[in-house]
Amino acid sequence: MDTKAFKRSLQQSENYHRKGFGQTEAAMGVMNTEYQSSLIQQIRQNNYQWKQGNVTIHLAQAFGFCWGVERAVAMAYETRQHFPKESIWITNELIHHPSVNQRLEQMEIKFIEVINGQKDFSQIKSGDVVILPAFGASVSEMQLLNDRGCTIVDTTCPWVSKVWNSVEKHKKRHYTSIIHGKYRHEETVATSSFAGTYLVVLNLEQATYVCDYILKGGNKEEFLAKFKNAYSEGFDPDTDLEKVGIANQTTMLKSETEQIGKLFEGTMLKKYGPAVINDHFMSFNTICDATQERQDAMLELVKEKLDLMVVIGGFNSSNTTHLQEIPIYQGITSYHIDNATRIKPNNCIEHKPLGKDLEIKENWLPEGSIVVGITSGASTPDIIVEAVIEKIFSAKELEYQSN
């Protein structure tokens, strides 16, 4: 399928909307009332630091809602205002924070049900309004909705669209797209649907395995088993890794994406030589500015003398998970929570360690004066960050009173 032509045709349809409905200002006003925080604004104005009692808070200098998320949420609010009585659906979570998605449900924006791992589009009727989330949607989903006569509101982040353009360039030149991402993540599912031949690699370890195979060969069956569900139909590692282009899920760790790109470039140089490297390797910068800014801000924050970190964001948020990796790798105790209710009485916290399920940690706040680093993922509203900070202040105040 010519995905580029389909996308162009869809965007020219009168049922397709990507720029809102002229009610953005009103939608943003409602959003600001619900999600902004006066405390967080004060902390920003105070050089991202705040002291209360024996707690000093250091906020990362880039955190929380990115402009792509703000745009997606505003468009969802605007859609409900513009279509007050129509059935409105969304193909996935709009963004990866439960509070925002719960608010959309309160506005009677319905999420498409997933049955046995597959989305059930049977309830969607012609004339229904369907929102595509910030992560985008696959070509097959867009085609189904268009054929059904739905009104499509596309909130796909422009940075995600930029990656789609990159893999389409790979496809046009018959390059295999090496996508750094999580193959089940909504964004990577969408990106791979625009690619021709593709392989999704999760991390540097998997990328190294692929590059070793390119240089030395190996067991094809083992390769295909290792990357099951992470490659295009008919993918053959013996023939489809001669020309590769690099792409990424925009929320992956910037430094790892860059390492993977350099690894593949070096591998193709070794195998084919510098004279023809451009016939075997392509790379475009598709690292999202907002993701990069938040990771860079976290790298600066962990240079401070912190007693611990709190990273706030949805547990299924890829960009939040990668923020959590930074202090952990620096040896700083860090807790990933999604909202303030995870901070329990008696100095306990329910948090999600990297790669594990939720667990309870007792005595998580040290006694005496402490310095706490705080950041949040790109889908987390400031009001959630405020609630977490207030909970920390309250916990330390209770400690002071009991002593």
From Swiss-Prot:
Which major enzyme category is it? Answer: oxidoreductase
Which residues make up the binding site for dimethylallyl diphosphate?
96, 185, 317-319, 379
The positions annotated for binding isopentenyl diphosphate are 96, 185, 317-319, 379
EC number of the protein? 1.17.7.4
Asked if the keyword Glycosyltransferase belongs to this entry, the reply reads no
Q: Name one Pfam family in it.
A: LYTB
The record, for CDD domains, names: lytB_ispH
Alphabetized Gene3D superfamilies for the sequence:
3.40.50.11270, 4-hydroxy-3-methylbut-2-enyl diphosphate reductase, catalytic domain (3.40.1010.20)
Which InterPro entries does the record associate with it?
LytB/IspH
Obligatory cofactor(s): [4Fe-4S] cluster
The cofactor remark states: Binds 1 [4Fe-4S] cluster per subunit.
UniProt keyword list: 4Fe-4S, Iron, Iron-sulfur, Isoprene biosynthesis, Metal-binding, Oxidoreductase
The UniProt GO MF terms for this protein read:
4 iron, 4 sulfur cluster binding; 4-hydroxy-3-methylbut-2-enyl diphosphate reductase activity; metal ion binding
Pathway listed: Isoprenoid biosynthesis; dimethylallyl diphosphate biosynthesis; dimethylallyl diphosphate from (2E)-4-hydroxy-3-methylbutenyl diphosphate: step 1/1; Isoprenoid biosynthesis; isopentenyl diphosphate biosynthesis via DXP pathway; isopentenyl diphosphate from 1-deoxy-D-xylulose 5-phosphate: step 6/6
- The active site annotation covers 187
Query: GO terms for biological process?
Result: dimethylallyl diphosphate biosynthetic process; isopentenyl diphosphate biosynthetic process, methylerythritol 4-phosphate pathway; terpenoid biosynthetic process
Q: Does the keyword 4Fe-4S apply?
A: yes
For [4Fe-4S] cluster, which residues are the binding ones?
A: 66, 157, 288
Q: Where does (2E)-4-hydroxy-3-methylbut-2-enyl diphosphate bind?
A: 96, 185, 250, 317-319, 379
User: According to its UniProt record, which reaction does this protein catalyse?
Assistant: isopentenyl diphosphate + 2 oxidized [2Fe-2S]-[ferredoxin] + H2O = (2E)-4-hydroxy-3-methylbut-2-enyl diphosphate + 2 reduced [2Fe-2S]-[ferredoxin] + 2 H(+); dimethylallyl diphosphate + 2 oxidized [2Fe-2S]-[ferredoxin] + H2O = (2E)-4-hydroxy-3-methylbut-2-enyl diphosphate + 2 reduced [2Fe-2S]-[ferredoxin] + 2 H(+)
Tell me, in a sentence or two, what this protein's role is.
Catalyzes the conversion of 1-hydroxy-2-methyl-2-(E)-butenyl 4-diphosphate (HMBPP) into a mixture of isopentenyl diphosphate (IPP) and dimethylallyl diphosphate (DMAPP). Acts in the terminal step of the DOXP/MEP pathway for isoprenoid precursor biosynthesis.
Q: Which family does it belong to?
A: Belongs to the IspH family.
In terms of HAMAP family, this protein maps to:
IspH (MF_00191)
Name of the protein this chain belongs to: 4-hydroxy-3-methylbut-2-enyl diphosphate reductase
User: What's the name of its gene?
Assistant: ispH
